[in-house]
Amino acid sequence: GEYGDGIEAKLNINGRSVSNSQVIIAGTTGSGKTNLLAVIIEQFRSLSIETPYPVNFLLFDYKGEFSDPANSHWLQHFEVDRSSILDPVKAPLPFTPFKDFSGRPINEINLYSTEMANALCAIDKASISANMSNRLSEAIVDAYKKTNGRPITFNEMLNQYRSKMVNADKDDSISSVLKQLVRNNLFETEDKIDLVNGCYIVKMDSFPKDGVIAKAIVYFVISKLNNIYEKLEKQAVNDECVQIRHFTIIDEAHYMLDFDNQPLRNLIAVGRNKGLSIILATQNMDSFKSKHFDFYANAQYPLIMKQQSINDSVIKDIFGVTGKDFNDIKAEIASLQKGELIIKDDTMSLLGISGKNYKKIKVTHLI
């Protein structure tokens, strides 16, 4: 886009001086958030596709706009076609979300089972007892024993869990969640695609946004990216920049921020080391102030668009302002129109000059 003075607006995503490449976007309905996401994807694709280091992406399409056949012409902006769209209603996602522990020590499986048990407990709002959580951890370990360490399935997990229940005919919160995951058949039993070396759009609008299935899809796909991260070589580096391999983009991200989402936290914390980055978009700036994780503190670029309401403490934290400067920024946010955003800018303070510590950008209209 452009700054108010007509100068081209750019974000330095892969410079050596950039500590991380995470981007968070807050904008209410009608703020132009979807177009901004499209512009960002188009930019990193068009600038990299003809180089030895193309930047790929995975987009969780909660609203179904990017995967809508009526919007198929959008895809050409990203150098992809409809084969990139993954619809879990029509076919399982073409990979297993579970780790392969073939030849690995049992202690690694024990640690992983606790992590997976915590995940299933976290994505469901129902009350889950400590006994149920422990039973699930044991079920995951036993499922891996049956596969000799190869990736398990939700069905195998369910069977092992039910074998440990006092009354297997009566569902508890865990077995109910597992049955939903088995019934929806969300994942293949083996990897048929490489998530990092391709571009994919996961169609999410068929599921309730705050429901178990939608949360499970995002959680376990991000968990899969963490598994891939462990096996990746470090990214290419030169004197000026580092390689960015992949962006994971979560629109309507607030549904994934209200519980302890460990894979997402891990990817944000260490993904940069191997060129894996995150873009989170949500409707309200409050969403990124999770009690589980401070997303603002870990984002290089908070992009603030038109807001339904403005949280004073968030503004103060992002821009480090008080008094008149705080009131100026708050007024600027309140006056934002569709397709406009403000971004923190430390140029003046670094030069020791008084002036605005933010800039307004008019985003290019793409879709």
Q: What do these predicted regions represent?
A:
Residues 36, 58-61, 304:
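A structural signal for short, well-ordered beta-strand segments and their strand-loop junctions
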Residues 1-4, 15, 29, 64, ...:
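Short, flexible loop/turn elements at secondary-structure junctions
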